[in-house]
Amino acid sequence: IKREQQPLLGQIALGVAAVPFLSILYGITKGKYNYKVLKYTLFFEDLPKEFEGYKITQISDIHSGSFDNKQKVEYAVDLVNKQKSDVIMFTGDLVNSKTSEMIPWKTTFSNLTAKDGIFSVLGNHDYGDYIKWESEEEKNQNFNDMLKLQKEMGFQLLLDDAKFIQKEDQRIAVIGVENWGKGFKQKGDLKKASSKIDANDFKILLSHDPSHWEYEVLKDNLHYHLTLSGHTHGMQFGIEIPGLVKWSPIKWRYKYWAGVYQKANQILNVNRGFGYLAFPGRVGIWPEITVITLKKGKRDRNNIF
């Protein structure tokens, strides 16, 4: 009996051992381009009535220096446009290390389009801090090239600044801060970015790192209705079953690491990222295109989002 069971037990052991290997293999070959469109409807009592049903598409963490499949990336850009949102908001990390990584993809991402334009902010990887430069002048030139590139692509880059989207006699404020992260560059100046806006404006804040929401935004005197972040990538590894399981090792580093959170009557969305970095794949945490619809109304247990 034992001789007959050993081959079966061996086969089971091999099968179990193969699961992580196959998962990683899938993540490298397919998962990193397995784009998912995640849709949320968010309710705000003080949303200006002219913006009822207003649609925002958020993308984050493009990391163009990692891409190796032009067709897949073009498909994803087309998928963003197919959402037909009123505005596109990009929350940083266009590149891995230097601006030139984006040059082969400039035309592709220049095809992004939305009625009210594209707003963007910088992430920690967009400053050229993760590469050794021959001189400070070369690093400064790289940064200036980043600013120029975003403008040429049609991105309205907000460097501690704010713009308004106007509909009839009502408006919403779009505020963008430079990178501010716990343990990372803390260049962003929320006070400066918000200096143009009124306290009663409906506010959408773009801030690359969700730790900024936790450590500064929630404590600020102004009420930021909706904050959009990225940065974590959900660690590109985890398990998500909607309504049942949401887990990634990144949870031990970031309290807010993927999806929608609500605190102090303010809402944060952490996008899982469009691209990938370091590990050349994604396992269980797929590249994300977020579509948010704004609705006027009171949030309760049945319609928080």
Locate the predicted segments by residue.
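N-terminal signal-anchor transmembrane helix
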Residues: 1-16, 26-59, 65-83
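N-terminal presequences and immediately downstream first alpha-helices
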Residues: 11-18, 225, 234
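Membrane-embedded alpha-helical transmembrane segments of multi-pass integral membrane proteins
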Residues: 20-23
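Soluble catalytic domains of enzymes that build or remodel membrane lipids, polysaccharides, and related
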Residues: 47-305
